[in-house]
């Protein structure tokens, strides 16, 4: 009885130090490629939603992404004739035809880059931006200019990633889980979300909010402090909290209120841009 791709990848992971493009067995290559194709098509995901803020990480899928770098040599890659790249991972759109783009139903504005093994949902828009391997970008989401979606990050439906936003990846430094931005979130310009932080549905981050696992997320109404998670429907701005000794303040993300009609009017997506 043949092994499943998951069991092959789990075994290969334990022996990863000995893998190389020259020595990798065919079954490992086949299993890794099957995962990358599934990620590319959106049929396999690094993490799956169980409830609001509750996600199950498929660690074996993340391992397959990491193993793929052990199985390929760098090689020249064309870029429309204006330059070349030298890498292990080809563009998602390397062999796309007009029919493929039409079937995908998304827009890709030059010079946006998405690597093979990432998924882009229907009616999504990629302005000049970067989507890394393993990432998932949901339907109707806007990835604005110079925004980056890190490896294996999970971006929900109808999300707006504003200009210069950085969504962290899992590859280096290796993270236990991906950054997750749930449906209908708005991430303000130049904000950074890293280290597997979860932004729950309908949340709004203002411009310049930085959140990692050690960042205090302070709710000014309740006094509660969260780590690694922004509760659903929160409106978050950059701020600071005083130290215990009162001699200095440290950066914190401050929940100032819950999303209301006024907030939604300011952050609504423009359907005209999704056609």
UniProtKB/Swiss-Prot annotation:
Provide the protein's localization. Cytoplasm
Identify the residues that bind substrate.
107, 144
Q: Care to name a GO molecular-function term for this sequence?
A: nucleotidyltransferase activity
Which keywords belong to this entry? Acyltransferase, Amino-acid biosynthesis, Cytoplasm, Diaminopimelate biosynthesis, Lysine biosynthesis, Repeat, Transferase
- A biological process (GO) annotation for this entry? diaminopimelate biosynthetic process
Which pathway or pathways does this protein act in? Amino-acid biosynthesis; L-lysine biosynthesis via DAP pathway; LL-2,6-diaminopimelate from (S)-tetrahydrodipicolinate (succinylase route): step 1/3
On whether Lipid biosynthesis is a keyword of this UniProt record, the answer is no
Record's superkingdom? Answer: Bacteria
Q: Kindly list the residue ranges recorded as spanning the membrane.
A: none
Provide GO CC annotations from the record: cytoplasm
Known catalytic reactions: (S)-2,3,4,5-tetrahydrodipicolinate + succinyl-CoA + H2O = (S)-2-succinylamino-6-oxoheptanedioate + CoA
Protein's UniProt keywords contain Amino-acid biosynthesis: yes
Q: What is its EC number?
A: 2.3.1.117
> PANTHER family attached here?
2,3,4,5-TETRAHYDROPYRIDINE-2,6-DICARBOXYLATE N-SUCCINYLTRANSFERASE (PTHR19136:SF52), MOLYBDENUM COFACTOR GUANYLYLTRANSFERASE (PTHR19136)
Q: Which NCBIfam families does the record match to this protein?
A: dapD, PRK11830.1
What name has this protein been given in UniProt?
Answer: 2,3,4,5-tetrahydropyridine-2,6-dicarboxylate N-succinyltransferase
Q: Which organism does this record belong to? A: Polynucleobacter asymbioticus (strain DSM 18221 / CIP 109841 / QLW-P1DMWA-1) (Polynucleobacter necessarius subsp. asymbioticus)
Question: What's the source species' lineage?
Answer: Bacteria, Pseudomonadati, Pseudomonadota, Betaproteobacteria, Burkholderiales
Gene this chain is encoded by = dapD
């Amino acid at each position: 009885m043949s092994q499943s791709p998951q069991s092959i990848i789990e075994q290969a992971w334990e022996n990863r130090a000995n893998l190389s493009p020259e020595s990798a067995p065919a079954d490992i290559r086949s299993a890794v490629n099957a995962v990358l194709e599934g990620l590319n098509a959106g049929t396999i995901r690094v993490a799956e939603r169980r409830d609001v803020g509750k996600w199950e990480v498929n660690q074996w899928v993340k391992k397959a992404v990491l193993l793929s770098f052990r199985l390929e040599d760098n090689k020249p890659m064309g870029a429309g004739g204006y330059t070349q790249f030298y890498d292990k991972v080809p563009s998602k759109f390397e062999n796309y035809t007009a029919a493929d783009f039409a079937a995908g139903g998304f827009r890709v504005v030059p010079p946006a880059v998405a690597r093979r093994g990432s998924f882009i949902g229907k009616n999504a828009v990629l302005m000049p931006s970067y989507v890394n391997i393993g990432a998932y970008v949901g339907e109707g989401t806007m990835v604005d200019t110079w925004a980056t979606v890190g490896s294996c990050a999970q971006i929900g439906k109808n999300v707006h990633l504003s200009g210069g936003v950085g969504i962290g990846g899992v590859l280096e430094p290796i993270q236990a889980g991906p950054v997750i931005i749930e449906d209908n979130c708005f991430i303000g310009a130049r904000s950074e979300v890293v280290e597997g932080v979860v932004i729950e549905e309908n949340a709004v981050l203002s411009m310049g909010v930085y959140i990692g696992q050690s960042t205090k997320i302070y709710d000014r109404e309740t006094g509660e402090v969260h780590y690694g998670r922004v509760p659903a429907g929160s409106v978050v701005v950059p701020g600071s909290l005083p130290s215990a000794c009162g001699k200095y303040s440290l950066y914190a993300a401050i929940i100032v209120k819950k999303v209301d009609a006024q907030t939604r009017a300011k952050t609504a997506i423009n359907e005209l841009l999704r056609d």
